[in-house]
Amino acid sequence: MSCRQSSSSFWSSSSSCGGGGGRGGSGGSMRSSFSRSSRAGGGGGGRFNSSSGFSGGGFSACGGGGGGSFGSSYGGGYGGGFSTGSYSGMFGGGSGGGFGGGSGGGFGGGSGGGFGGGSGGGEGGILNTNEKIVMQNLNSRLASYMEKVLELEESNTAMEKQIQDWYSKRGPKVFQKDNTHYYDTIEDLKDRIVDLTVRNNKTLVDIDNTRMTMDDFRVKLEMEQSLRQGVEGDINGLKKVLDDLVMAKSDLEILLDSLEDEKNALTKNHKEEMSQLTGQNDGDVNVEINVAPSTDLTRVLNDMREEYEQLISKNRQDIEQHYESKMTQIEQQMTNSGQEMESNMKQVSQLQHTIQELNVELQTQLTTKSALEKALEDTKNRYCGQLQQIQEQISELEAQLAEIRAETECQSQEYSILLSIKTRLEKEIETYRELLEGGQQDFESSGAGQIGFGSGKGRQRGSGGSYGGGSGGSYGGGSGGSYGGGSGGSYGGGSGGSYGGGSGGSHGGKSGGSHGGGSGGSYGGESGGSHGGGSGGSYGGGSGGSHGGKSGGGYGGGSSSGGGSGGSYGGGSGGSHGGGSGGSYGGGSGGSHGGKSGGGYGGGSSSGGGSGGSYGGGSGGSHGGKSGGSYGGGSGGSYGGGSGGSHGGKSGGGYGGGSSSGGGSGGSYGGGSGGSHGGKSGGSYGGGSSSGGGSGGSYGGGSGSGGGSGGSYGGGNRRPSQSQSSSKSADCDDDSQEHKMRY
């Protein structure tokens, strides 16, 4: 998600949540080396330590917007990077100069030079870069771009029309056959297939019924055969009984024959005896004997015969009756068993039909169950897929909503930042107008100094070195060296060093440091001398001398003997007898005899009272000091702020103000520290310090022991008599350049 685009704004070209820039920008190769930045919103890389300070798109509203304000489109760090003319990178040209190698020393320099091709210099050169000209240039270029877009769209439409005409004329023709006359035949065949299918099913059902009937008859036949075998066994048993009876009958007949033969023999013998007895008694002999009458044997035998015949007939009748009764019973049993068997067979056939129907119904239910289970599984899979798609859409929409919310928050925060910057710029412009109206006479006495990739005018005793400042003599301090730095003489302190900073002599404190530091060397802080207070360097803190406060580290503020201010991203501690103020993202601790105060992202405090600014709060000096700033102020300045000194001093300045013991002004982007008892100091991007007066220059600033002011980009030195106007000059030049950069 990119918070800003490079098509229609003054910010640098963007990348994904990081710094912008690159070799494609119109600012040239040196600009491309300064404007690369990381995703986290940090400074972009480059040859000239452009990642320090607020370089390379580090200041973006959403934490990583590509090449935001004070970032990649202006070059690298707050020192050397701005000497390459990288400000000219906006939209491939634009106005060069300001913050990019075009601005000269003091109020006399014009904007122009290096890679930007801005407007020429002269007196009042700061005001010649009119924003209306820039807007007209941008509007004209936008109009040309829109005309080109319209022309390309018209040509694209014409080409599409030509392509469609070509395809309509030469495109392949597709011939479709008319197959409607086959539809009736296909329908008839489908009907026949359906009829044959129905018939086939009916035939299969009949075959199944016939098979079942055949099975029933087979079972019935088996049962009849078993019954027949049982009846045959009974008949065989009865035949044995009949044979026994026949044998008994034959035995009785034989016995009867034997008895008849015996009877005949007895009858014959009796007759013979009777004849013999009658033959012997031919004479009449009457003998009367009184005897019992004799038994008639014939009658007895006849009686016996009749009796036996009756017995035989009776036995025969009994046997016949018993046989008939038994046969009747057996026939009745056979009839009953046949009926029962028939009824049982019917029941069995019915049960078999029922079982078959139940089996068919069971198979149907099983088939239906399997089909329903399959349909249920398909439905589950389909709805699971739909649910997964819906969940993915929900997650995508939630991610988009989160991105929209984050972008809305970024835009809201950016809007609030731009609104506050707009308000502050309007106030600063009004202040600059008042200052310029009062200091118009100082422009006429400005000297000439040369800065790499640009030209301008400066004041007295300023000589330009390569890419930056010059060197000064004793009792006035100087600046110079490569890319902005230099060394100063004794009794006045110097400013410079690589990319902005330098070291001063005794009795005057030190100022400068790489990329905008207050005092000390690069990426650290040094300590100031006695009775003058020191200012902190970039990315680290510095410590003040005896009877003076300490100043915090990175991005920020300086301190003096009247009260110390904490820098951003680290915080500092105040010195004795004056109290200290906490820096942003860390807070600070106050010294003895002074209170502590916490602001948003760090607040500051003093021994007498103060007011908190937005995003960090600031601290006011004791006995009447005024302070207040936005975006981190310790007293005054935004993004780091400094603290005001004792006995009435005021401090201010953008992005890191300075402090003084008697009244000083903070510079932008690092600020400087003022001297003792009256001097004012403060420069943009690293202001200078003085022990008795003087003002720090922009981009590194200089210092003087009794007067003098630091020039831009490392700046020159001023004489004692020019201290006040030089201070105004530096402040005005600094703030006007800051105004151009923010715009």
From Swiss-Prot:
SMART domains: Filament. Keywords: Coiled coil, Intermediate filament, Keratin, Phosphoprotein. Residues 1-16, 29-39 have a biased composition (Low complexity). PROSITE patterns: IF_ROD_2. The modification Phosphoserine is found at residues 14, 16, 55, 155. Residues 131-166 are annotated as: Coil 1A. GO terms for cellular component: intermediate filament. It comes from the Eukaryota. Residues 186-277 are annotated as: Coil 1B. Pfam families: Filament. Residues 131-443 form the IF rod domain. Residues 301-439 are annotated as: Coil 2. GO terms for molecular function: structural molecule activity. GO terms for biological process: intermediate filament organization; skin development; spermatogenesis. Residues 278-300 are annotated as: Linker 12. Coiled coil: none annotated. Residues 167-185 are annotated as: Linker 1. Residues 1-46, 440-468, 501-743 are annotated as: Disordered. Residues 440-709 are annotated as: Tail. InterPro entries: IF_rod_dom, Keratin_I. Residues 17-28, 449-468, 501-717 have a biased composition (Gly residues). There are two types of cytoskeletal and microfibrillar keratin, I (acidic) and II (neutral to basic) (40-55 and 56-70 kDa, respectively). Heterotetramer of two type I and two type II keratins. May serve an important special function either in the mature palmar and plantar skin tissue or in the morphogenetic program of the formation of these tissues. Plays a role in keratin filament assembly. Plays an essential role in the correct development of sperm. This is Keratin, type I cytoskeletal 9. It comes from Mus musculus (Mouse). The gene is Krt9.
